[in-house]
C-alpha cells in the first residue's frame, strides 16, 4: 500500500471535463489526482513551410506551466525570454506521440496545434498532457469531419501515456505522484496505442539500476494503466467518434 492509499497497480483518480474552453475546436481539463492540465486543440488551414504543397497535415504541440502550479513559484518562460530545455523536450514528445496515430495525408493541408497548460502539478504532467491532448485533438478532427466528412478518418488509433517506477520500499508502481517521482530509483514514461503498440519508452535509473524482470513488471503496469486511460477516452469521446477511429 502506498502512502496515498493506492495499490501498486492503481492509477490516481482520473477526471476528464470535455469542452472546457469555449473557443478552441477541441478542449479538455484532465485531472490525474492533483495534477491538472488544460489541453486545447486549434485548427489552422496552413502547414509549416517545409510541408507546403505536399497536401499533408501536421500536428504540433506547446506546453507550459502556470507559475504557481508547483509548490514554489516559477518564473514565466515569457519573462525569461526563452523556452527551457525541459519544456522543449516535452513539447516535442507530445507532438511526436500524437503524430504516431494520425494519418497526415488524410488530414489534408492543415495544422492542429495542441496547447497543454499545467494549472496544478503533482507529478505526471507530460503523460497527462499526452492523454488529454489526444482527446482534444480528436474532438477538433471530429468537428472537421462533421463539416466535410473525411474519406478516411485521420485518427488511426487511440493513444495514452502513463508513468511507472521503482520505489525503494514499494517496488514497481504505476502512475507516480510528485513525492514518489522525487524518491524513485527508476522512473519511466510509457506511451502506447489502443492496439497495444508502443510509441515511446523513456526509462532512467537514478543512482540505481533495474533488472530485466523489473522492466517487464514496469511495462505490464504501464499497459494496464494505459488500457484504463483509453477506456476513459472512449467514454469521453462517445460511441460515434470511437467508431470512426476504428474505421467503422
From Swiss-Prot:
InterPro entries in UniProt: ExoRNase_PH_dom1, ExoRNase_PH_dom2, ExoRNase_PH_dom2_sf, PNPase/RNase_PH_dom_sf, Ribosomal_Su5_D2-typ_SF, RNase_PH, RNase_PH_bac-type, RNase_PH_CS
Key words of the record: Nucleotidyltransferase, RNA-binding, rRNA processing, Transferase, tRNA processing, tRNA-binding
Source taxon at top rank: Bacteria
UniProt entry tagged with the keyword Calcium: no
Residue positions binding phosphate: 86, 124-126
EC number(s) per entry: 2.7.7.56
GO molecular function, one term: tRNA nucleotidyltransferase activity
Similarity comment text for this entry: Belongs to the RNase PH family.
HAMAP family: RNase_PH (MF_00564)
Protein's UniProt name: Ribonuclease PH
Organism: Listeria innocua serovar 6a (strain ATCC BAA-680 / CLIP 11262)
Amino acid at each position: 500500500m502506498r502512502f496515498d492509499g493506492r495499490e501498486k497497480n492503481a492509477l490516481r483518480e482520473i477526471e476528464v471535463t470535455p469542452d472546457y474552453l469555449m473557443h478552441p475546436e477541441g478542449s479538455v481539463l484532465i485531472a490525474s489526482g492533483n495534477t491538472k492540465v488544460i489541453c486545447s486543440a486549434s485548427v489552422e488551414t496552413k502547414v509549416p513551410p517545409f510541408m507546403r504543397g505536399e497536401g499533408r497535415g501536421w500536428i504540433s504541440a506547446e506546453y507550459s506551466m502556470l507559475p504557481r502550479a508547483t509548490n514554489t513559484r516559477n518564473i514565466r518562460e515569457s519573462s525569461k525570454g526563452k523556452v527551457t530545455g525541459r519544456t522543449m523536450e516535452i513539447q516535442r514528445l507530445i507532438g511526436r506521440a500524437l503524430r504516431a496515430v494520425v494519418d497526415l495525408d488524410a488530414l489534408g493541408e492543415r495544422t492542429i496545434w495542441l496547447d497543454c497548460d499545467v494549472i496544478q502539478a503533482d507529478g505526471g504532467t507530460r503523460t497527462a498532457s499526452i492523454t488529454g491532448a489526444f482527446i482534444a485533438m480528436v474532438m477538433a478532427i471530429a468537428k472537421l469531419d462533421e463539416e466535410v466528412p473525411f474519406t478516411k478518418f485521420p485518427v488511426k488509433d487511440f493513444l495514452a501515456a502513463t508513468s511507472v517506477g521503482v520505489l525503494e520500499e514499494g517496488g514497481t508502481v504505476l502512475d507516480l505522484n510528485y513525492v514518489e517521482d522525487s524518491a524513485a530509483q527508476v522512473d519511466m514514461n510509457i506511451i502506447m496505442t489502443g492496439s497495444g503498440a508502443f510509441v515511446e519508452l523513456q526509462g532512467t535509473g537514478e543512482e540505481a539500476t533495474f533488472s530485466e524482470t523489473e522492466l517487464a513488471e514496469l511495462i505490464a503496469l504501464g499497459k494496464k494503466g494505459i488500457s484504463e486511460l483509453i477506456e476513459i477516452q472512449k467514454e469521453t469521446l462517445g460511441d460515434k467518434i470511437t467508431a470512426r477511429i476504428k474505421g467503422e
